[in-house]
Amino acid sequence: MKISVSSYSFYQYVRAGKLTLVELPKLAHDIGFDAIEFIDIPGETQEEKLALAAQIKAEADALGMEINAYTIGACLYQETDEASDKEVARLVQQLDVAVALGAKVMRHDVVYALGKTGAARSFDGMLPTIAKNAQRVADEAAKRGITTCTENHGYISQDSDRVERLFNAVNRDNFGILVDIGNFVCVDEDNVTAVSRLAPYAVHVHAKDFIFKSGKEVKPCGLSMQMIPFTRS
């Protein structure tokens, strides 16, 4: 097992111009991490993304730092075959970015939100399309020696029951689960039970915690908004 850090942890510094993505492997190395994970390499074109990924990999290689995962956004539920083809093609390009980084794992989302009509109204309605498109991405990933995965993330596919059903529906040897230890509490699920359920399918792990509150804490608010009845006289 290797302990890594995500580039997302330094997002505010990168956004403020205090760090560049190319500098992150050294920072992670100096802090003491074994590896680093990158999120959505930016670029106006695929060529720019590949060039930046190659720069990052060269810096990591010089330090003996592994880039152990590449994490991207995606929506694998689409209303039409044409839209599905377009999104799958975009993810295949992202697989090439993962190759340029030297990452052996690529995590992608599966859906962002429920819709108001048709199959998009429920997770089960969307699942066949999501699974089919995830299979297509996984099959392309296999040609590149990459394992794809999805995360318990984004509310729609976050509880362990849905994530396990998605895993079974995709049914590819190089498709697994990125288990985020903390995210289950966001859908009112016991973390220990959920992690135990998905552990056999895990190919990558995010260690996260939350401060869980009862909802009964006293918090300041505007006058007359809560407990104290203010009236004009």
What do the predicted segments below correspond to?
Residues 1-34, 51, 57, 61, ...:
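Histidine-acidic metal/acid-base catalytic patches
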Residues 7, 31-40, 69-74:
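Short, conserved active-site loops that position catalytic residues or coordinate cofactors/metal ions
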Residues 9-11, 40-42, 73-76, 110-114, ...:
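Active-site-proximal loop/turn and secondary-structure-junction residues that shape catalytic pockets
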Residues 12-16, 45-47, 79:
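A generic structural signal for short coil/turn motifs at secondary-structure boundaries
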Residues 35-60, 110-122, 215:
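Glycine-rich, proline-tolerant flexible connector loops at the mouths of alpha/beta enzymes
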Residues 37, 69-71, 107, 149, ...:
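Conserved beta-strand positions in the central sheet of alpha/beta enzyme cores
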Residues 42, 74-84, 223-224:
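The substrate-binding groove and active-site-proximal loops of carbohydrate-active enzymes
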Residues 58-66, 77-177, 186-188, 197:
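Active-site acidic/histidine proton-transfer and metal-coordination neighborhood
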